[in-house]
Protein backbone atom coordinates (compact mmCIF):
# COMPACT_ATOMS: atom_id res chain seq x y z
CA UNK A 1 0.00 0.00 0.00
CA UNK A 2 1.26 3.47 -0.91
CA UNK A 3 1.88 5.60 2.17
CA UNK A 4 -0.76 8.34 2.09
CA UNK A 5 1.29 10.91 4.02
CA UNK A 6 3.96 10.74 1.30
CA UNK A 7 1.59 11.00 -1.68
CA UNK A 8 -1.44 13.09 -0.65
CA UNK A 9 -0.84 16.71 -1.80
CA UNK A 10 -1.78 18.25 1.58
CA UNK A 11 -0.42 15.55 3.89
CA UNK A 12 2.84 15.59 1.90
CA UNK A 13 3.46 19.22 2.96
CA UNK A 14 2.75 18.38 6.62
CA UNK A 15 4.97 15.30 6.33
CA UNK A 16 7.90 17.30 4.94
CA UNK A 17 7.46 19.97 7.63
CA UNK A 18 6.78 18.01 10.82
CA UNK A 19 7.31 14.26 10.34
CA UNK A 20 10.05 13.22 7.89
CA UNK A 21 11.89 16.54 8.19
CA UNK A 22 15.65 15.91 8.59
CA UNK A 23 16.77 17.71 11.76
CA UNK A 24 20.23 18.08 13.35
CA UNK A 25 20.84 15.40 15.99
CA UNK A 26 22.22 17.84 18.58
CA UNK A 27 19.68 20.68 18.81
CA UNK A 28 19.01 21.55 22.45
CA UNK A 29 15.93 22.71 24.36
CA UNK A 30 16.63 26.24 23.06
CA UNK A 31 15.17 25.01 19.75
CA UNK A 32 11.81 24.27 21.43
CA UNK A 33 10.57 27.85 21.34
CA UNK A 34 9.54 27.88 17.68
CA UNK A 35 6.94 25.18 18.25
CA UNK A 36 5.94 26.76 21.59
CA UNK A 37 5.31 30.07 19.80
CA UNK A 38 3.08 28.22 17.33
CA UNK A 39 1.12 26.73 20.25
CA UNK A 40 0.92 30.17 21.94
CA UNK A 41 -0.48 31.64 18.72
CA UNK A 42 -3.14 28.91 18.51
CA UNK A 43 -4.10 29.39 22.18
CA UNK A 44 -4.37 33.17 21.66
CA UNK A 45 -6.49 32.83 18.51
CA UNK A 46 -8.87 30.33 20.14
CA UNK A 47 -9.29 32.16 23.46
CA UNK A 48 -9.51 35.46 21.55
CA UNK A 49 -12.25 34.09 19.31
CA UNK A 50 -14.38 33.09 22.31
CA UNK A 51 -13.75 36.47 23.97
CA UNK A 52 -14.78 38.28 20.76
CA UNK A 53 -18.13 36.45 20.89
CA UNK A 54 -19.02 38.34 24.09
CA UNK A 55 -16.98 41.55 23.81
CA UNK A 56 -18.44 44.83 22.51
CA UNK A 57 -16.07 47.40 20.98
CA UNK A 58 -17.93 50.49 22.14
CA UNK A 59 -16.60 52.99 24.69
CA UNK A 60 -19.86 52.88 26.65
CA UNK A 61 -19.96 49.08 27.01
CA UNK A 62 -16.40 47.71 26.45
CA UNK A 63 -15.37 47.77 30.13
CA UNK A 64 -18.73 46.30 31.22
CA UNK A 65 -18.56 43.58 28.56
CA UNK A 66 -15.19 42.41 29.94
CA UNK A 67 -16.67 42.35 33.46
CA UNK A 68 -19.67 40.44 32.03
CA UNK A 69 -17.32 37.87 30.43
CA UNK A 70 -15.59 37.29 33.78
CA UNK A 71 -18.81 37.14 35.85
CA UNK A 72 -21.58 35.71 33.66
CA UNK A 73 -20.08 33.74 30.76
CA UNK A 74 -19.39 30.04 31.44
CA UNK A 75 -15.66 29.83 32.22
CA UNK A 76 -15.32 33.38 30.86
CA UNK A 77 -12.92 34.27 33.69
CA UNK A 78 -10.69 31.37 32.61
CA UNK A 79 -10.78 32.29 28.91
CA UNK A 80 -9.90 35.90 29.73
CA UNK A 81 -7.11 34.94 32.15
CA UNK A 82 -5.64 32.47 29.64
CA UNK A 83 -5.74 35.13 26.92
CA UNK A 84 -4.16 37.88 29.06
CA UNK A 85 -1.45 35.64 30.52
CA UNK A 86 -1.05 33.80 27.20
CA UNK A 87 0.24 37.11 25.81
CA UNK A 88 2.92 37.18 28.53
CA UNK A 89 3.93 33.59 27.75
CA UNK A 90 4.02 34.48 24.04
CA UNK A 91 6.50 37.31 24.67
CA UNK A 92 8.54 35.22 27.09
CA UNK A 93 8.97 32.58 24.36
CA UNK A 94 9.62 35.30 21.75
CA UNK A 95 12.44 36.90 23.73
CA UNK A 96 14.05 33.50 24.43
CA UNK A 97 13.66 32.53 20.75
CA UNK A 98 15.35 35.76 19.56
CA UNK A 99 18.06 35.39 22.24
CA UNK A 100 18.74 31.84 21.02
CA UNK A 101 19.04 33.18 17.45
CA UNK A 102 21.61 35.78 18.53
CA UNK A 103 23.63 33.37 20.72
CA UNK A 104 23.90 30.56 18.17
CA UNK A 105 24.21 32.73 15.04
CA UNK A 106 20.88 31.64 13.55
CA UNK A 107 20.56 35.19 12.14
CA UNK A 108 22.87 34.16 9.30
CA UNK A 109 19.79 32.58 7.70
CA UNK A 110 18.92 36.12 6.60
CA UNK A 111 15.44 35.56 5.08
CA UNK A 112 14.27 33.53 8.07
CA UNK A 113 15.70 36.14 10.46
CA UNK A 114 14.15 39.13 8.65
CA UNK A 115 10.71 37.50 8.51
CA UNK A 116 11.19 36.77 12.23
CA UNK A 117 11.84 40.46 12.98
CA UNK A 118 8.70 41.40 10.99
CA UNK A 119 6.82 38.78 13.03
CA UNK A 120 8.12 40.32 16.27
CA UNK A 121 6.94 43.79 15.19
CA UNK A 122 3.51 42.42 14.16
CA UNK A 123 3.08 40.60 17.49
CA UNK A 124 4.04 43.79 19.35
CA UNK A 125 1.45 45.77 17.35
CA UNK A 126 -1.19 43.12 18.08
CA UNK A 127 -0.43 43.16 21.81
CA UNK A 128 -0.58 46.97 21.89
CA UNK A 129 -4.00 47.26 20.21
CA UNK A 130 -5.26 44.34 22.32
CA UNK A 131 -4.28 46.06 25.57
CA UNK A 132 -6.54 49.01 24.64
CA UNK A 133 -9.68 46.84 24.26
CA UNK A 134 -10.75 46.42 27.96
CA UNK A 135 -10.99 50.26 28.03
CA UNK A 136 -9.55 50.61 31.51
CA UNK A 137 -7.49 53.60 32.66
CA UNK A 138 -4.15 52.15 31.53
CA UNK A 139 -5.72 50.99 28.23
CA UNK A 140 -6.91 54.52 27.46
CA UNK A 141 -3.83 56.41 28.60
CA UNK A 142 -1.44 53.85 27.10
CA UNK A 143 -3.22 54.29 23.75
CA UNK A 144 -3.09 58.09 24.11
CA UNK A 145 0.63 58.21 24.96
CA UNK A 146 1.85 55.70 22.37
CA UNK A 147 -0.29 56.92 19.45
CA UNK A 148 0.78 60.48 20.31
CA UNK A 149 4.38 59.49 19.51
CA UNK A 150 3.41 59.67 15.83
CA UNK A 151 3.08 63.45 16.26
CA UNK A 152 6.90 63.56 16.52
CA UNK A 153 7.07 62.87 12.76
CA UNK A 154 7.86 66.22 11.11
CA UNK A 155 5.16 67.98 9.07
CA UNK A 156 2.58 65.15 8.85
CA UNK A 157 2.76 64.04 12.50
CA UNK A 158 -0.37 65.67 13.93
CA UNK A 159 -2.47 64.77 10.86
CA UNK A 160 -1.27 61.18 11.16
CA UNK A 161 -2.22 60.97 14.86
CA UNK A 162 -5.74 62.27 14.18
CA UNK A 163 -6.04 59.83 11.26
CA UNK A 164 -5.11 56.91 13.57
CA UNK A 165 -7.50 58.16 16.27
CA UNK A 166 -10.38 58.74 13.84
CA UNK A 167 -11.05 62.06 15.58
CA UNK A 168 -9.42 64.65 17.82
CA UNK A 169 -8.82 62.29 20.76
CA UNK A 170 -8.75 58.59 21.62
CA UNK A 171 -12.47 57.77 21.47
CA UNK A 172 -15.04 55.33 20.10
CA UNK A 173 -13.60 55.35 16.57
CA UNK A 174 -10.17 54.44 17.99
CA UNK A 175 -11.52 51.54 20.04
CA UNK A 176 -13.53 50.14 17.11
CA UNK A 177 -10.58 50.19 14.70
CA UNK A 178 -8.23 48.75 17.33
CA UNK A 179 -10.64 45.83 17.81
CA UNK A 180 -10.75 45.27 14.03
CA UNK A 181 -6.93 45.35 13.89
CA UNK A 182 -6.61 43.07 16.91
CA UNK A 183 -8.88 40.54 15.19
CA UNK A 184 -7.12 40.54 11.81
CA UNK A 185 -3.44 40.75 12.86
CA UNK A 186 -3.15 37.21 14.38
CA UNK A 187 -4.15 35.75 11.00
CA UNK A 188 -1.47 37.86 9.31
CA UNK A 189 0.95 36.55 11.99
CA UNK A 190 -0.09 32.98 11.12
CA UNK A 191 0.64 33.60 7.41
CA UNK A 192 4.01 35.18 8.25
CA UNK A 193 4.86 32.24 10.54
CA UNK A 194 4.25 29.85 7.63
CA UNK A 195 6.60 31.95 5.43
CA UNK A 196 9.12 31.97 8.33
CA UNK A 197 8.97 28.14 8.37
CA UNK A 198 9.16 27.96 4.57
CA UNK A 199 12.45 29.89 4.54
CA UNK A 200 13.79 27.87 7.48
CA UNK A 201 13.12 24.59 5.65
CA UNK A 202 15.04 25.87 2.62
CA UNK A 203 18.24 25.69 4.70
CA UNK A 204 17.36 23.37 7.59
CA UNK A 205 17.86 24.21 11.26
CA UNK A 206 21.05 25.61 12.72
CA UNK A 207 22.50 23.77 15.75
CA UNK A 208 24.42 24.71 18.94
CA UNK A 209 27.86 24.10 17.43
CA UNK A 210 27.15 26.27 14.37
CA UNK A 211 28.79 23.60 12.18
CA UNK A 212 26.99 22.29 9.07
CA UNK A 213 24.90 19.36 10.40
CA UNK A 214 24.10 17.72 7.02
CA UNK A 215 26.26 14.68 7.75
CA UNK A 216 24.23 13.80 10.87
CA UNK A 217 20.47 14.27 10.59
CA UNK A 218 17.58 12.47 12.30
CA UNK A 219 13.83 12.51 11.48
CA UNK A 220 11.81 15.18 13.28
CA UNK A 221 9.22 12.58 14.34
CA UNK A 222 9.44 10.91 16.87
CA UNK A 223 12.63 12.53 18.26
CA UNK A 224 11.66 16.19 18.24
CA UNK A 225 7.89 15.75 18.43
CA UNK A 226 8.35 14.15 21.87
CA UNK A 227 10.89 16.83 22.83
CA UNK A 228 8.47 19.58 21.77
CA UNK A 229 5.69 17.85 23.72
CA UNK A 230 7.82 18.07 26.88
CA UNK A 231 8.37 21.79 26.25
CA UNK A 232 4.63 22.18 25.74
CA UNK A 233 3.95 20.57 29.14
CA UNK A 234 6.22 23.16 30.79
CA UNK A 235 4.55 26.00 28.86
CA UNK A 236 1.05 24.87 29.84
CA UNK A 237 2.13 24.35 33.45
CA UNK A 238 3.44 27.93 33.77
CA UNK A 239 0.45 29.38 31.86
CA UNK A 240 -2.08 27.53 34.04
CA UNK A 241 -0.22 28.43 37.24
CA UNK A 242 -0.38 32.08 36.18
CA UNK A 243 -3.97 32.04 34.94
CA UNK A 244 -5.40 30.07 37.88
CA UNK A 245 -3.38 31.24 40.89
CA UNK A 246 -2.27 34.81 40.16
CA UNK A 247 -4.00 36.02 36.98
CA UNK A 248 -3.41 39.72 37.77
CA UNK A 249 0.27 39.37 38.72
CA UNK A 250 1.53 40.87 35.45
CA UNK A 251 -1.34 43.34 34.93
CA UNK A 252 -1.73 46.93 36.09
CA UNK A 253 -4.18 47.73 38.94
CA UNK A 254 -5.15 50.97 37.11
CA UNK A 255 -6.86 48.88 34.45
CA UNK A 256 -9.54 47.86 36.96
CA UNK A 257 -10.84 51.44 36.73
CA UNK A 258 -12.89 52.38 33.64
CA UNK A 259 -11.21 54.78 31.20
CA UNK A 260 -11.53 58.41 32.27
CA UNK A 261 -10.11 61.13 29.98
CA UNK A 262 -10.30 63.66 32.85
CA UNK A 263 -8.10 61.70 35.24
CA UNK A 264 -4.50 60.78 34.37
CA UNK A 265 -2.93 57.82 36.26
CA UNK A 266 0.21 58.79 38.27
CA UNK A 267 2.45 56.38 36.30
CA UNK A 268 1.55 55.52 32.72
CA UNK A 269 3.38 52.36 31.71
CA UNK A 270 2.83 49.51 29.25
CA UNK A 271 2.75 45.77 29.98
CA UNK A 272 6.05 44.25 31.18
CA UNK A 273 7.09 43.00 27.73
CA UNK A 274 7.28 46.58 26.36
CA UNK A 275 9.05 48.13 29.35
CA UNK A 276 12.59 47.75 27.92
CA UNK A 277 11.61 49.72 24.80
CA UNK A 278 9.64 52.22 26.91
CA UNK A 279 12.74 52.83 29.07
CA UNK A 280 14.81 53.53 25.92
CA UNK A 281 12.08 55.90 24.66
CA UNK A 282 12.07 57.84 27.96
CA UNK A 283 15.85 57.98 28.28
CA UNK A 284 16.12 60.64 25.54
CA UNK A 285 14.77 64.06 26.61
CA UNK A 286 13.48 64.84 23.10
CA UNK A 287 10.28 63.56 21.51
CA UNK A 288 11.57 62.73 18.01
CA UNK A 289 14.89 61.43 19.41
CA UNK A 290 13.04 59.14 21.80
CA UNK A 291 10.77 57.78 19.06
CA UNK A 292 13.78 57.10 16.80
CA UNK A 293 15.60 55.32 19.67
CA UNK A 294 12.45 53.26 20.35
CA UNK A 295 12.29 52.18 16.70
CA UNK A 296 16.05 51.56 16.57
CA UNK A 297 15.90 49.33 19.68
CA UNK A 298 13.82 46.79 17.72
CA UNK A 299 14.95 47.44 14.12
CA UNK A 300 18.60 46.99 15.19
CA UNK A 301 17.84 43.26 14.97
CA UNK A 302 17.70 43.63 11.17
CA UNK A 303 21.38 44.67 10.95
CA UNK A 304 22.71 41.99 13.34
CA UNK A 305 23.62 39.68 10.38
CA UNK A 306 25.73 42.53 8.92
CA UNK A 307 27.58 42.97 12.23
CA UNK A 308 28.73 39.33 12.37
CA UNK A 309 32.53 39.47 12.27
CA UNK A 310 33.49 36.11 13.81
CA UNK A 311 34.83 33.16 11.81
CA UNK A 312 32.65 30.87 13.89
CA UNK A 313 28.89 31.02 13.59
CA UNK A 314 27.86 30.11 17.13
CA UNK A 315 29.00 31.65 20.42
CA UNK A 316 29.43 28.14 21.85
CA UNK A 317 33.24 28.33 21.64
CA UNK A 318 33.59 32.15 21.96
CA UNK A 319 33.86 33.10 25.66
CA UNK A 320 34.31 36.87 25.12
CA UNK A 321 31.17 37.08 22.97
CA UNK A 322 29.35 34.90 25.50
CA UNK A 323 30.22 37.34 28.29
CA UNK A 324 28.95 40.29 26.23
CA UNK A 325 25.76 38.38 25.36
CA UNK A 326 24.95 37.83 29.04
CA UNK A 327 25.79 41.47 29.82
CA UNK A 328 23.26 42.39 27.10
CA UNK A 329 20.69 40.08 28.73
CA UNK A 330 21.29 41.68 32.16
CA UNK A 331 21.08 45.11 30.51
CA UNK A 332 17.67 44.29 29.00
CA UNK A 333 16.41 43.11 32.40
CA UNK A 334 17.67 46.40 33.88
CA UNK A 335 15.84 48.37 31.16
CA UNK A 336 12.65 46.40 31.89
CA UNK A 337 12.93 47.34 35.57
CA UNK A 338 13.61 51.02 34.76
CA UNK A 339 10.63 51.18 32.38
CA UNK A 340 8.33 50.42 35.30
CA UNK A 341 9.82 53.10 37.58
CA UNK A 342 8.77 56.77 37.85
CA UNK A 343 10.77 59.42 35.94
CA UNK A 344 13.03 60.61 38.77
CA UNK A 345 16.62 60.13 39.92
CA UNK A 346 18.37 57.69 40.15
CA UNK A 347 16.14 55.90 37.61
CA UNK A 348 16.68 58.52 34.88
CA UNK A 349 20.48 58.16 34.80
CA UNK A 350 20.34 54.34 35.14
CA UNK A 351 17.94 54.22 32.18
CA UNK A 352 20.16 56.48 30.08
CA UNK A 353 23.29 54.45 30.84
CA UNK A 354 21.49 51.15 30.15
CA UNK A 355 20.12 52.52 26.85
CA UNK A 356 23.61 53.64 25.78
CA UNK A 357 25.10 50.28 26.76
CA UNK A 358 22.36 48.43 24.79
CA UNK A 359 23.35 50.09 21.50
CA UNK A 360 27.07 50.07 22.33
CA UNK A 361 27.05 46.30 22.95
CA UNK A 362 25.24 45.42 19.73
CA UNK A 363 26.87 47.95 17.38
CA UNK A 364 30.44 48.11 18.70
CA UNK A 365 31.49 45.68 21.42
CA UNK A 366 30.09 42.41 20.02
CA UNK A 367 31.53 42.91 16.49
CA UNK A 368 34.90 43.85 18.07
CA UNK A 369 34.77 40.74 20.27
CA UNK A 370 34.27 38.65 17.11
CA UNK A 371 37.36 40.18 15.50
CA UNK A 372 39.40 39.71 18.68
CA UNK A 373 38.39 36.04 18.90
CA UNK A 374 39.37 35.53 15.25
CA UNK A 375 42.81 36.97 16.06
CA UNK A 376 43.16 34.81 19.20
CA UNK A 377 42.39 31.67 17.17
CA UNK A 378 45.39 32.20 14.90
CA UNK A 379 48.12 29.58 15.59
CA UNK A 380 50.86 32.21 15.99
CA UNK A 381 48.95 34.03 18.75
From Swiss-Prot:
Positions of heme b b562 binding: 83, 182
Cofactor binding notes: Binds 2 heme b groups non-covalently.
Residues that hold heme b b566 according to the record: 97, 196
Chain segments annotated as transmembrane: 33-53, 77-98, 113-133, 178-198, 226-246, 288-308, 320-340, 347-367
CDD domains linked to this entry: cytochrome_b_C, Cytochrome_b_N
Cofactor: heme b
Domain of life: Eukaryota
GO MF annotation terms: metal ion binding; ubiquinol-cytochrome-c reductase activity
Family: Belongs to the cytochrome b family.
Record text on subunit structure and interactions: The cytochrome bc1 complex contains 11 subunits: 3 respiratory subunits (MT-CYB, CYC1 and UQCRFS1), 2 core proteins (UQCRC1 and UQCRC2) and 6 low-molecular weight proteins (UQCRH/QCR6, UQCRB/QCR7, UQCRQ/QCR8, UQCR10/QCR9, UQCR11/QCR10 and a cleavage product of UQCRFS1). This cytochrome bc1 complex then forms a dimer.
Other comment: Heme 1 (or BL or b562) is low-potential and absorbs at about 562 nm, and heme 2 (or BH or b566) is high-potential and absorbs at about 566 nm.
The protein's name: Cytochrome b
Protein species of origin: Dasycercus cristicauda
Taxonomic path: Eukaryota, Metazoa, Chordata, Craniata, Vertebrata
Amino acid sequence: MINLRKTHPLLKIINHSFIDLPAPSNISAWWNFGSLLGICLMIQILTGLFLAMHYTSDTMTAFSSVAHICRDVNHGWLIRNLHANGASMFFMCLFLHVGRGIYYGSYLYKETWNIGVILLLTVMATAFVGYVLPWGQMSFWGATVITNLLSAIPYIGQTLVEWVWGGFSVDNATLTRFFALHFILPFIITALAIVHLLFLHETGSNNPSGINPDSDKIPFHPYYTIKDALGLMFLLLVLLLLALFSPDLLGDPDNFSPANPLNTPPHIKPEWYFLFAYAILRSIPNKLGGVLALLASILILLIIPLLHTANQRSMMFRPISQTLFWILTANLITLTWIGGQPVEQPFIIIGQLASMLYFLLILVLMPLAGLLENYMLKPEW
